Amino acid sequence: RLNYQKAYDIAIDAMKRIKDAGYKARWYILGEGSERNSLEKKVKELGLEKEFLMPGAVSNPFPYYKQADIYVHATRFEGKSIAIQEAQTLGCAIVASDCNGNREQIIHGEDGLLCKLDPKSIADSIISLIDDKEKRRKISEAARKKDIVHKGEIKLLLELMQ
């Protein structure tokens, strides 16, 4: 959703920092919402039309996760995030803002990176994973394994309910 909670305004500023630091990256935002026009305007003002892409609502987000080296979940507040769980399932290295819901799903430095919700912290976390492929691989693998644990927990709960 393109709304205030998701902090895409801050994400756009983080992408500008990444580009200005000389990195080539693409950031896809899926979905629709009330902030689309203001976000598109900001992207254009910062010259990020080729780097920050908003294809709109898609019926299947998994191809986007699958091609992503890094999944970024920078939100102002969050409950349990299905998007984080989907990214873990597909083994994405995750960068997420350090808020309650995200903190419950990610162990910083192990299966993802938690950062402050500001452009510098987000950009620095992303750049650290771009620069350190081994760190990115380890985080990605830990995220994938965490999903296996989730599946085991769900199976156990279903068995207990029968």
Residue ranges and their predicted role:
Residues 1-17, 23, 34-40, 82:
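A conserved mid-protein helix/loop that constitutes part of the nucleotide-sugar donor-binding site
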Residues 11-15, 27, 122, 157:
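A structural motif in glycosyltransferase catalytic domains
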Residues 57, 76:
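Aromatic "clamp/platform" in nucleotide-sugar-dependent glycosyltransferases that forms part
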Residues 86, 99-109, 113-114:
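Short acidic/histidine- and often glycine-rich active-site loop of Leloir-type glycosyltransferases
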Residues 93-96:
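Short hydrophobic beta-strand element within catalytic cores of glycosyltransferases
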Residues 108-109, 113-119, 128-133:
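Conserved acidic donor-binding segment of nucleotide-sugar-dependent glycosyltransferases
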Residues 114, 134-161:
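A charged, aromatic-enriched C-terminal amphipathic alpha-helix characteristic of glycosyltransferases
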